[in-house]
């Protein structure tokens, strides 16, 4: 286990202790932090059902309720912001990439729409901005039938750390609009949004390979492939947990990797 991963786990522990201080009176909690964190991460990685968990000294329902309590308080997102700030101090990205991916929807209620690429089935659209190392800087969920042109502005406004001035922003033809180019200039970014008349070729996708690589990493967390959670906030918190695991295991802190 790397020092960066221990640091991320410690950040999550500090955030949980700040929001949910230990009980002074009454019985001690049966579920320890390490056991709860490891069980939640196992579910996100493998995609197993919660009832398949076999935690010690408690039931799987306790782990499930703990995850929902942490996610409702934004524990994983806050810890990821702290880790991303440490990462941003060490390196300055030269460019960013934006793209989205469809997530199949089973029980979700909000952020649900018809997926035009999957016979109109219900889906959510997960959008993200990554840097030149493939590290995500924000996530945004929208209904599956939302146009990409409407997603650039909320993503830029929700970036967890301020973007590097004069950096480039790469995007495909779906984001081509005068409004999106103006938004990039507002945040000090040089837009590299491909125009609709651009012919696809190797050069047009040279820099955008990092966003495709991130989604390949994202798909390795089996729980994130299909959305079973009713609220989109719980799904996004699990996404931030996976992103924190990805960032901590990368060799970018100078302390090695898992």
Question: Where would I find each of the regions flagged by the language model?
Answer:
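Short alpha-helical elements
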Residues: 1-258
């Amino acid at each position: 286990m790397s020092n960066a991963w221990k640091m991320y786990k410690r950040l999550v522990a500090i955030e949980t202790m700040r929001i949910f201080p230990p009980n002074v009176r009454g019985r001690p909690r049966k579920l320890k932090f390490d056991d709860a964190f490891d069980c939640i991460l196992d579910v996100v990685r493998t995609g197993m059902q919660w009832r398949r968990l076999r935690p010690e000294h408690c039931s799987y329902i306790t782990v499930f309720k703990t995850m929902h309590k942490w996610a409702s308080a934004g524990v994983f997102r806050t810890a990821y912001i702290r880790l991303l700030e440490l990462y941003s101090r060490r390196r300055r990205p030269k460019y960013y990439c934006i793209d989205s991916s469809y997530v199949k929807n089973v029980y979700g209620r909000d952020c649900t729409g018809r997926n035009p690429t999957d016979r109109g089935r219900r889906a959510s659209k997960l959008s993200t901005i990554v840097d030149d190392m493939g590290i995500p800087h924000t996530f945004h969920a929208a209904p599956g039938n939302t146009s990409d042109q409407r997603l650039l502005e909320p993503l830029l406004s929700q970036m967890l750390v301020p973007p590097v001035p004069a950096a480039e922003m790469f995007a495909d033809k779906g984001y081509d609009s005068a409004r999106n180019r103006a938004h990039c200039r507002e945040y000090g970014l040089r837009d590299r949004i491909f125009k609709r008349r651009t012919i696809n070729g190797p050069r047009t996708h040279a820099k955008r390979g990092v966003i495709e690589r991130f989604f390949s990493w994202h798909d390795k967390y089996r729980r994130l492939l299909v959305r079973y959670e009713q609220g989109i906030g719980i799904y996004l918190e699990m996404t931030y947990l996976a992103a924190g695991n990805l960032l901590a295991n990368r060799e970018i802190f100078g302390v090695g990797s898992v």
